[in-house]
Amino acid sequence: MKRDYPDRPIVGVGAVVVDGERALVVRRATEPLKGEWSIPGGMLELGEKLREGIVREVREETGLDVEVFDVLDVFDSIFPDREGRTQYHYVLIDFLCRPMGGELQASSDVSEAKWVTAEEAGSLQMKAATVGVIRKALGLTGQMCPSSVPRN
């Protein structure tokens, strides 16, 4: 399915990867949001389950392996073009995750990857909803529990 001017919304997943008091952020190298900071994530592939998509996207973009916990947020991300047509429309499901291995390095469709505190996230060029979900995740880190999303 093409990303721009889709026939229907595209399902995407995001990972709020938390390590202590910091969360992982990436700088997007492709549209939409090229040059902006975000959390690792992307589109699900056909036949791919949610948690598989999260693990794959984080590994592709950052080189890290993650354990997936619960859903943090679900929201629409709609980008109209100059004529008012819907150029991009995503339904995004963000999950709380923690790093389990690998070596942090930007790759795939990101130009940078780094760890930030909640305060630092607020000072980056980043959508307010992303800053909010990072702050929510950092407030929940003491309550991490295995994902209620089925593993099969």
Segments the model singles out, each with a brief description of its role:
Residues 1-14, 85:
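Acidic, metal-coordinating catalytic segment for phosphate/diphosphate chemistry
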Residues 15, 71, 95-97:
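A structural signal for short, well-ordered beta-strand segments
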Residues 22-60:
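Conserved Nudix-box catalytic region and its N-terminal flanking loop in Nudix hydrolases
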Residues 65-74:
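A short coil-to-beta-strand element that immediately follows conserved catalytic motifs
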Residues 76-103:
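Active-site-adjacent beta-strand/loop module that shapes the phosphate/pyrophosphate-binding cleft
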Residues 94, 105-137:
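NUDIX/MutT-family hydrolases
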Residues 131-152:
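Charged phosphate-binding loop/patch that engages nucleotide di/tri-phosphates or the phosphate backbone
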